Amino acid sequence: LMGFAAREALHIASYAHLIETLGMPDTTYSEFKEYEVMVEKHEYFTNTVNNGLDISIKMAALSAFTEGLALFSSFIMLLNFPRHGKMKGMGQIITWSIVDETMHTEGVIKLFRTYIEENRHLWNDKTKKQIYDIAEKMVDLEDKFIDLAFQMGKVEGLRSEEVKQYIRYIADRRLISMGMRGIFKVKKNPLPWVEEMINAPTHTNFFENRATDYAKGALKGSWDEVWA
């Protein structure tokens, strides 16, 4: 969990660097408060975490439907720029963020399933209904956010309905990974190019940059060998 937190700190620094590079003012950080849809997203998440729900439901809400869902509509819309050869540096940030958030989601869902396995009395119809309700609400909030984002006009190579279907596809994947059934019935990835961009190997000029792909090989051996 500390590793997850460290990655989140890197995400904050990365997006702050992006905003500064684009010359956007500091007020940008609070401008989301001017949009009812974004305020509703923030308040719903805050209320879900701070209310009296069981820790298992909070884990599901945080991992599956916040890190694992609510961020992804923004990720997809931003990743569409480097897909068309624009803002490639930002595309790297988004790609790494998706990889990290997916790892966080999978990690906490594994923790959720272990917790449920050790507390079987909690896994009942009431708990399942609460999780399904959260999933449906989060998807509804993302629909509103996507509509807001597309109000400015058409986006090259991307339609709002495609993003909405992708969110439903992701939501079902999260539910299934928690041992539940998918309720949005989107079995095929509507945006296959997303997977292609995320999974593509990082190629970089050795003298200008360095690759940042995760590598299993780096986890083998001993600490003595690392510093040899």
Please name every model-derived segment.
Residues L1-A228:
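Non-heme di-metal
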